[in-house]
Amino acid sequence: MKNITTLLFDVDGTLLDATEFIIQATEHALSVKGLSVPDRTTISKNVGASFPDYYFSLTGTHEHTNELIEIHRTFQYSNYHLAQPYPNSLQTLKYLKAKGYKMATITTRSKKTSHQTLINAGVFDLFDVIISGEDAAALKPDPAPLF
């Protein structure tokens, strides 16, 4: 077996607890558009999909998708503090970096929100590569962002 030299991490739900960051943005966007706001369990089950698929799964229509995405992002730009690092994530990443591992993150979120939440968590500079939603032709779980 070859030695492992590189580690890949998801951001939301692995390094950061972004539950409130995502759910509150979703609730806000749907409310602003006057649409029905599903319960938090339903919202959580759909997290991770592309924005168009995410909002379609919650509303059953593509009619307001672009507006919902814009409202969602605007909310997040003012509420980065809602994404918090999990306990010991900073210490663990520092330990791995000190051991010489190359490290990268892969997320479906935008570059702006993923970078800022990683900066706020104090882990941004520990990564050699940060792959965001707009960096790849296909999103997770497709392996395309890795190549």
Where does each model-flagged region fall?
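N-terminal helical cap/lid subdomain that shapes the substrate entry/recognition surface
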Residues: 2-90, 95, 99, 115
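A short linear-motif detector with a strong N-terminal bias
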Residues: 23, 109-110
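Structural motif
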Residues: 46, 106-108
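Substrate-recognition "cap/lid" segment bordering the active-site pocket of phosphatases
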Residues: 82, 110-147
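Short loop/edge segments at beta-strand edges and connector loops
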Residues: 87, 107, 132
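Short active-site oxyanion
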Residues: 100-105
